[in-house]
Amino acid sequence: MTEKRNQNQNIAVRFLLGVVLLVSTPLLQATTYTTGINPGEWKTVSSVFECRLEQPVPLFGDIVFRTRAGEASGAYLRSKTARFAAGDAAMVARTPVWRPKQESINLGAVAMKQGTRPLWLGSKRAELMLSHLSDGREIEISNPAWYRESPEARLAVTTIGFRHEYSNYLSCLAGLLPANFDQLRRTAVYFRNGDAEYLNATARSHLDKIVTLVKHDPKIQKFYIDGHTDTVGDRADNLELSKLRAELVSQYLISKGIPAEQLVIRWHGERYPASSNGSWDGRSKNRRVTVRLEKLEASQPNTKPANSMAGVDPPK
């Protein structure tokens, strides 16, 4: 009787173990996020300020290739919730399942963070990914999942619909502005010793970029023009020299279509050096005019006359 009871218990245990294995085995497989053979839904978001090429991935989020005006390209993942654990993820380029199988190309390890922006790649990696996608290869990124029930999470970036939108993305890149607001919001142009009558090619190029940006961004409505000098010469003469430099830059901007009423012109002489006046290099950095841009939402009412006297307020 005891022997029969033990046999029944062994059968029950084996049955339960079998049920556990059947239930747990799928959970131990890698979780793959992909559009599969469905339309990839690639889309291009275009403006003169930024170009983005995006693919939404069901249950994951998006893979985004982005280039801002004046900057190098990049790529990042945008997920709805954390899907990957932190650590080095593997990235490969592979042939889609519907094409003759070829050996996958190892694109190296990429640093993954846990969170909703787990991955950011610089220009070199982003352009490499775009090149493989354009050639018809998928990109697969794999790393341990952040939750224990799945040993690995994989993201497959598909090529379906890619080439058409990639062409639109390239067209957008051709129309980007030469620089963005963050790059130009505080610009300095420099002068030769004692000079306040000549803007060299580099100075004109910087100012022209500002003009081009402003023509496409109506929110930029305030310009603070601050003139400076080094300490060579008389203090009073330097104050006048900084005024002439600030006025020269202001007149150039006005000649390019910037409304004069949007300019706040100030001059400070040698009061606010950007570098030490004890060296030639330092003095060359102090002979400058800075142009600071402000957007409408960030601007404060200006209660001072446009040609405010030097030294009343330090340049911001």
What are these regions (language model features)?
Residues 30-180:
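N-terminal targeting leaders that direct proteins to extracytoplasmic destinations
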Residues 24-25:
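N-terminal signal peptide c-region/cleavage motif recognized by signal peptidases
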